[in-house]
Amino acid sequence: LSVIHRGIATMTLDTGRCPKWLFSRMVTLGRDMTRILIEEYGPDEFVKRIADPVWFQSLGTVLAFDWNASGLTTILTAALKEAVRGEERALGIFIAGGKGKTSRKTPDQITEWGRRLDLGEAKTQALVYNSKMSAKVDSSLVQDGYQLYHHIFFFSENGAWAVVQQGMNTDAGTARRYHWFSENAKDLVCEPHTGIAAQARHDTVLNLVARESDPTRDLSIEMANSSYGSLMRDIEILRRHSSSLSKVLALKHRGSGEQLTLLKLEDVEFRSHPVVHEDFSKSQYLEKILARVTSIRPRTYEELVAMEGVGPKTVRALAL
């Protein structure tokens, strides 16, 4: 079960609720459209099209949710989930997850469908893993200031699957939707995107899935496989030489004479990355997670990211 990133869409962040009369009509029309699309093209093609941000947006508009705002994502996926309820086996598609607290039930709902469909432990856990990793990559490796609050997982019995998840940036008043689709063998942590469609562009973004970040990912793994004592000695150097001012520190290795240059930045106007406000050189959390990481010694960057407890702060700390 391989994966590629299919695309990203950015839209305004709206408030309020969808009228009940509109939602019920979206469910009714969505049920008929889903039946026709699957009858004509099959469940795998339907899942594939869900992963296309433009097609997905168009489907929401056709179902009469014609606001170009964040609510289209949550309302459309909820309507589709309700539309196929009770007909999943006949249609050949299955939907797990949703908005807010429901998004955290995605693994359990996938597992339940795996049991009912007799998919087997390996296939079911692979689906659960891809669901979790898509969320981790978009929240930890693409730190663009959007906090995920919606995650929904579509899949077919043949193994095709798609993820539609959305994050919000309250400062910018925008939402960003991320689409994933299982197709072709791709690296989960290196340039998984195949297309980005956005109205808003942010310059202060930590993009650790970029190919240019290869050296950073490699060095992060090198550090994760070094000794905890070695890492802590480097942190002690930071503690002795850090200050609250932004400046460059030039340190010489006593043995080799090799110079190490460190950049210390003050915390100003960087709200899209609140993690940068934490002084990692004095973080007990960082010490705890680094101790765990160095004891486990992940072999690849994907294994590092997949570790429990490793999130945006740990990833950014290693990158810094």
Spans of model-derived segments:
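Short, glycine/acidic-rich beta->alpha junctions
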Residues: 145, 296-297
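Alpha-helix initiation and N-capping motif
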Residues: 52-56, 283-286, 298
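Helix-hairpin-helix
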Residues: 276-285, 293, 300-320
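Structure-specific DNA junction-binding interface
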Residues: 1-273
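C-terminal extensions
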Residues: 2, 31, 284, 288-291
